[in-house]
Amino acid sequence: MGSYYSTESTKSNESNETTNNVEGIVDTIGGTVESINSDGIITTSENIVEIVLKENNQPTIFETQESNILEIVTTKIDVLKKILRLIGEVTSECQFSFQNVNEGGRIIVTELHDNKTILLKLVLKGTGFDFYKCSKSKITARLYLPDIDEALGLIGVDDTNTNPIIISMKKDKETSIFITRIDNSGFTEQVELPCRESVGLNIPLPKTTFQGKIVINAEKFRKICERICSVSDLIKISLTDKEVSFSARYYNLDFRYKHSVESKVLGQTIENYFFIDGMLKFIKYFQSSDEISIYIKKDFPLVIHGPFDNFGSIYVFTSPIEE
């Protein structure tokens, strides 16, 4: 079984080929913007902003600190924990890239599984949070995921506390991330997370012109994968210009699901085998009503792309294997 990913310092092919609506999978940062405001934020002075919290549509006053080069405000503790669980499917130590770009900034995570057969890219929009400020074009922080989970447990255990959590980095201490919250008694709780040494990750994301695109409901695809998983470790995906089938071999029987599709296979059939467990790990992070896109090409990593709540997008690359 070959690996399509490497952490060696090799540059990926920067060709002009498109990827059938997934050009955003491989992108470069081409500039910065000076000011970042997310929807629902009214600036009342240089450092005081009134935020309308997305959780309960209630306004709250937040004072930004000039000493902070990074500030993220959110009441969505459950989403933060979901992010940790998602990344934890691949690794226990993650490098976050906080970026100051157009449309409110973003956070990017690109991590490779230890077996080098699954690559996860998570893109979170700054506008998904109640407030997002990144004073540099890019800030990198490598953190141990269990440390973050423990910190959220320490200051997020009180379900009656509706105050938001603040994630920040100080200008004079770029070696730590701070998680802060005011409790119901007015006391400030803060946990300092030491950043681990950042590594110069150069994981080239597979880039190609895909031959087919499958659009399917996330819940439907999850059920198909679960049923196939009950009889086999492998799933075979076969694609023609009119139809896709998901199948598995069970003793002398072929177990198959079919789905109509528009693709660019043009009279040929594409067949690839994948480990079903690698897909099931990530499908559960999509909401049942989500539509996901599956991009496929013969002997090339499968790409599953879909929304992550209202925070951004998930891209999962999984390598094909020999039957």
Curated annotation (Swiss-Prot):
One of its GO terms (biological process) is regulation of DNA replication. InterPro entries: DNA_clamp_sf, Pr_cel_nuc_antig. Gene3D superfamilies: 3.70.10.10. Keywords: Lipoprotein, Myristate. A lipid is attached at residue 2 (N-myristoyl glycine). The keyword Coiled coil does not apply. Residues 1-21 are annotated as: Disordered. GO terms for molecular function: DNA binding; DNA polymerase processivity factor activity. This is Uncharacterized protein L823.
